Amino acid sequence: MKNFYNVYRQNLVEQDLPTIYCDMDMVLCDFLKGAEKELGKPFPEVDKDKRWPIIHKNKTFWENLEWMPGAKRLWSFVNKYDAHILSAYSTNDSNSIPGKMKWLRKNAKLTQRSRIHLVLRKQKQDFAMTNNKPNVLIDDHLKNIKEWEAKGGIGIHHLSVSTSLNELKKLGYK
């Protein structure tokens, strides 16, 4: 028989965990693979002035990106804690926001708009704290992590699914 005190304490600790914010591109979905498919060669090899107009022409680019390897496992883990999506949208692509929303609905089965935050990159740091309590950001872009931490949040620089999961477990997520 379970000890009521231990069950109560475990629930109290789990309820007090920081809110998780998870990036999309290169954390959940494979932007670079999709871009290479669209451009015909790796994204960094195409001139900046040429690559974005080509990507923007494809109205379904964002919604048809593939999962990153292992990312379904990461999403399954963080989704147990009602994780939020915090992703930057492309300012010059009117398909970016609706495409990311469709991707989330179709792939992550996420329909709660209150858990989806599609913002300008520099606005991500504004979600670092809630009521003077730090939140967690999982993001592949180190600049975002540094800005997040400077605002008081807990940053997890996403290098692989296993390292991100290990960092979350160190914070008390099971």
Annotate each PLM feature.
Residues 13-174:
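Catalytic phosphate/metal-binding cores of nucleic-acid and nucleotide-processing enzymes, i.e., regions
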Residues 2-15:
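Proteolytic processing junctions in secreted/extracellular precursors
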